[in-house]
């Protein structure tokens, strides 16, 4: 029963969003929100109008490129750092990892001003690198991969050392393949966080040709009025990439959480 109630609570907003996208603007603001079905026909043309008017192909391209590079950079850096913290011994290891944990406790908004100044001085405003910059390194990913590497038996590396493998070979050929589920989990987390990121794209991308879906949706809000069906149609189109990603990787997502002990 609880599962049914929770499913209903989560599904209703999506249904309301899609059905509002099929109404006229007058109907969306004059009819009670409890009457969610369109009364004057199903206006599928709202999707076509939004697609053409707001250059959704450009928004999709910018968003997917940002997600791709953030995922690649976050997984690579977190895997190397996680291996170092989880398997190697070096001076100051515990102190450095405590700094990683402290960074996880600090709100990301605190770093926006220094990050903006760095991107601005490098001349990377309104560029893909400017969008990707905050996601190059992730403390959460380092923690997630560290727990993944720590859960692997030490005998694997010891056997590889006996066979003559150096540290690079042990990392690339033995340890990394065994933490694939944690890497996929981190990739999904990073993709979701990047997709939802609104403040950073709004700050670094003032050009309509370089902005992302989240920032583009925010800019649809008018000062004196809004076309709500158009906004809901745009929101429906915007969530499609994340729905597709989840449908494809839901098994790996669950496995990554279970095997690594990571959590949001």
Question: How does the language model describe each region?
Answer:
Residues 2-264:
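A structural signal for multi-pass alpha-helical bundles of membrane permease subunits
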């Amino acid at each position: 029963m609880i599962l049914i109630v929770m499913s209903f609570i989560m599904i209703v907003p999506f249904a309301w969003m899609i059905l509002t996208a099929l109404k006229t603007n007058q109907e969306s603001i004059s009819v009670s929100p409890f009457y969610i079905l369109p009364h004057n026909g199903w206006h599928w043309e709202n999707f076509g109008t939004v697609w053409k008017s707001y250059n959704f192909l450009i928004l999709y391209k910018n968003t997917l490129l940002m997600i791709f590079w953030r995922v690649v950079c976050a997984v690579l850096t977190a895997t190397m750092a996680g291996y170092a913290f989880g398997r190697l011994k070096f001076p100051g290891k515990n102190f450095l990892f405590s700094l990683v944990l402290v960074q996880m406790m600090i709100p990301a908004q605190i770093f926006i001003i220094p990050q903006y100044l760095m991107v601005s001085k490098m001349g990377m405003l309104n560029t893909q690198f400017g969008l990707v910059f905050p996601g190059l390194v992730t403390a959460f990913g380092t923690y997630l991969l560290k727990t993944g590497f720590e859960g692997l038996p030490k005998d694997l590396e010891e056997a590889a050392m006996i066979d003559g493998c150096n540290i690079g070979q042990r990392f690339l050929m033995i340890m990394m393949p065994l933490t694939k589920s944690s890497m996929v989990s981190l990739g999904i987390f990073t993709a979701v966080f990047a997709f939802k990121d609104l403040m950073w794209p709004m700050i670094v991308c003032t050009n309509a040709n370089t902005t992302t879906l989240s920032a583009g949706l925010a800019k649809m809000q008018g000062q004196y009025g809004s076309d709500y069906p158009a906004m809901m149609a745009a929101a429906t189109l915007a969530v499609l990439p994340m729905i597709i990603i989840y449908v494809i990787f839901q098994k790996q997502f669950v496995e990554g959480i279970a095997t690594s002990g990571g959590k949001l």
